[in-house]
Amino acid sequence: MKEILHEDLVVVRSVCNIFCLRLNMPIIERYSAIKNGGIVFTGNTLGLSKAANVASPGVLGSIGAFISLDTSLQVSTFPAGTTLDYTKNGSAAVLNLPAGSTVLYAELVWGGLFRSSANNISALLDNPVEFITPSGSNSIAPDVSTKQNFNITEEGVTLGFYVRTANVTTLVKNAMNGTYSTGKVPALIEAIDARTSETNHA
């Protein structure tokens, strides 16, 4: 997900994920300016909903497969372009800024489930992710000053989620409009619903 400024008057003070208020997470100022401009968000999911206790398509509040940009990969009866391997996940979105726009600041934000009742991949959370712009592929390390890990308890199961961010202003300024994708995002997938209390995202 990128945050980009263009046209109309705005004041940008912080970047925060939706869990900040619930979990009393700190709001960290990433960019501050008073400019004629606007804010644009673009992004996509990395996970597809699953059926009960299997890695198959369904409508539970948990993911059963990652999206992959490699359409030769496929998980069970999920569509082509799916994987269980986080190093092969990836998702794309199109950025379309108005003509004449100038990018003042752009931030990449990613996250997912890192702890279930059976597994914990916290050692992988600071690994670089792959960020592909219209100009090419880039390895992006998370900014240590904004990293967030947090635990919640649902139905007696303690789950761990994380958020990482990185300043990608130069990359977006150079590439501007087109298709952007992010991949190799560490996250857990659990086929057994009790391990996540049907609560999972990436």
Predicted regions and their residues:
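Cationic, amphipathic, low-complexity alpha-helical segments enriched
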Residues: 1-23
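Disulfide-rich extracellular domains of secreted proteins
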Residues: 16-202
